[in-house]
């Protein structure tokens, strides 16, 4: 069990468990599917996901942690050529193939453990799965390199259940600059990036700004018609780190209506002492700065070797909630943070999508590689007796 019998008597922990029974705790980012790919490359069919002690995540500990929903990340690494700002599509086909494999792993887990997990694509489906006693399973993609420069691929990812895409991972791409790269290339969003954000708004795909440069974050927050998320990020005012966002970005996020989901990654949490308490500091900073209706949790479990101490695996979420209650954070604010905020954003993103489609917003087209030459076109005209 996650706590001793004596600890269960603690008022804050008891209250935390009650709150987690009322509202689904939705983790904005979990990399267990990629851990499966790395640790069990030839054993996926026989893997027992109820107990995987080598990982941060398994079904038993998700239950112990009272997790109500997870955005499973269909992450794959950036192509090597992206490090040189070479975004040629040929380098991304392997990323696309691996992305489809990762989405297959996620769907396979949901199907195999249908008594524990349920696919969720909308807020209503999250509630339906949660109230059935299962964990709502949502899908995120961690980088636009995974769409192989194709809006059509992105639309198909949405059809497969993907509900957010992080604009970048560790490298710049065709669309945007990353904070982890050697330096800016576009100065924020590129022209293609502006178009892809608009298309994400149109189809109802949440924009995720974790990993992006501050310039990219500000650019998106200035143009997005829908609220955005930071699926796993931290605050620069609490800890200086390249991945952490400054207060002026948080202020723009408040105006946008989005959610900043605090991560458990050690260095962004605190270079010297990354602890549960320090994670709580980041949560409180967002809450105090822009309101608890704009903060969430995005652990990055199984995306890093170690997380903040005290938050060592998915069973430990109640301890963070108890710490925040101890600090005086209200029940209402806790409920917003653990799940209601991201569910609100999901609803808002859908509403924006519906309005854009109703007003005839044009889809983002792409130019296909030519497959017919003029000789072939002439043959079609001749055969069908149709001439210009």
Curated annotation (Swiss-Prot):
Phenotype seen when the gene is deleted: Completely abolishes the 11'-deoxyverticillin A production.
EC assignment: 3.4.13.19
Catalytic activity: an L-aminoacyl-L-amino acid + H2O = 2 an L-alpha-amino acid
InterPro entries reported for this sequence: Metal_Hydrolase, Pept_M19
SUPFAM superfamilies per the UniProt record, alphabetical: Metallo-dependent hydrolases (SSF51556)
Keyword Acetylation found: no
Binding residue positions for Zn(2+): 29, 31, 142
Keyword Metal-binding (UniProt): yes
Induction text: Expression is regulated by the cluster-specific regulator verZ.
Gene3D superfamilies: Metal-dependent hydrolases
Top EC group: hydrolase
Family note: Belongs to the metallo-dependent hydrolases superfamily. Peptidase M19 family.
Name listed for the protein in its UniProt record: Dipeptidase verJ
Name of the gene encoding the protein in the UniProt record: verJ
